[in-house]
Amino acid sequence: MTYNDVLARELSTDVRVLIRDYFKSREDEQQFPRELLYQFIERFDIFSLLLDSQDSVLRTEFLTFIRLISKDFPAFSAVLLTQACYGIYPILRYGSQEQKASYVEPLVRGEILAGLGFSEGKLMDSLEVIATTARKTETGWSLTGKKSIVSNCRYTDILLILAKVQEADGEDGYGVFIVDTIRPGVTFGDDIAKPGLQGLPVNSVTFDQVILPEDSLLGLTLNGETQLNDIIKKLQLGLSAISIGISEGAFEKGLAFVKVKRGFGKRLIDATVYQHQFADLYTKLCAAEAYFASCKDRMEEDSLFVSQIKLYTTKVAIEISEEIIRLIGPLQTLDDIPIDRYLKDAKTVEIYGKSGDSIRKRIAAQWIKE
């Protein structure tokens, strides 16, 4: 089960009121929604809903929240998902007892924010392309390198950074390191422009011989590849929920528009052509929902299946948003319905958590092997 209808109905009004009030006070669309984050934590304790008892599967309640919020403010859902999947989940799932004691509660309460750095601007067919290195020292580690894209970056207190480590036998190992962002040698780049998800800041970050304590290695073990693959899988599941929320938001706003009486007391939805077009969009949305709902049967043993769901749900979000714009775009000046924001957000989600093209390449690999 990936969606709780009862919970969604109970929370829908409160969620929309909080988001509406935030939009009224927001100075600009680039503003990081920190105040709204604190309100959601205080009102709903949202991050305590993250995991089930096995600490390995995103809970239905959390996915429901993410999807519900995305109907009105997808960028805020992405901020929450980043904190959850790039901060809380990795430490709770893989951290040592000391790491859990130091970070989990402050992360859940929103007292510290986290991000994850793994991309270096190259297609990651394997971890061999990673150039960021962690060198063992007498007292811990020295981290050097650059990550090209890190979400929530300049607002984070800690970053989880994937780095290459040369082991004693000369082989390369990979580990995830917990880095306090106030450490000397940590430098954030300028904000990276993107079409949508405004309010979710993305930056590069450079590490110049950053000195880390010995216990900064996540789980105190070089298990970076397994950890990263699991983290990305959880993120893609959350991004699928965001995509369905975007589809629902665009569809519902478009439907509300065509159900309003216009000139001569007529509604657009009274025309057969609009009825058929919205029926097609609704069918497409239902297909995406069904695909998403099937994920838990295969999620643990099949990461590619989760990637395929992410690919399809984002594609549907883009298509529904584009079609709604095409149907009501010429008339949209009559109503304040920012449908175009859904399209921009959907296109940005498509490249987050491994891009659509990288997923397509991975799917196609099974057919081109010798």
Functional labels for PLM-detected ranges:
Residues 93-119, 138-139:
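FAD-binding glycine-rich core of flavoenzymes that anchor FAD
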Residues 78-98, 124-127:
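N-terminal glycine-rich flavin-associated loop
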Residues 8, 12, 328-370:
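Glycine-rich phosphate/cofactor-binding loops in nucleotide/flavin-utilizing enzymes
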Residues 144-188:
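A short core secondary-structure module
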Residues 1-82, 102, 109, 367-370:
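Amphipathic, small/basic residue-rich leader segments at the start of a protein or domain
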Residues 132-135:
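A structural signal for short hydrophobic beta-strand segments in well-ordered beta-sheet cores
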Residues 20-31, 259-266, 282-315, 325-333:
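C-terminal helix-coil-helix/basic helical segment that borders enzyme active sites and/or dimer interfaces
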Residues 2-6, 190-285, 349:
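Glycine-rich beta->alpha junctions and the first turn(s) of the following alpha-helix
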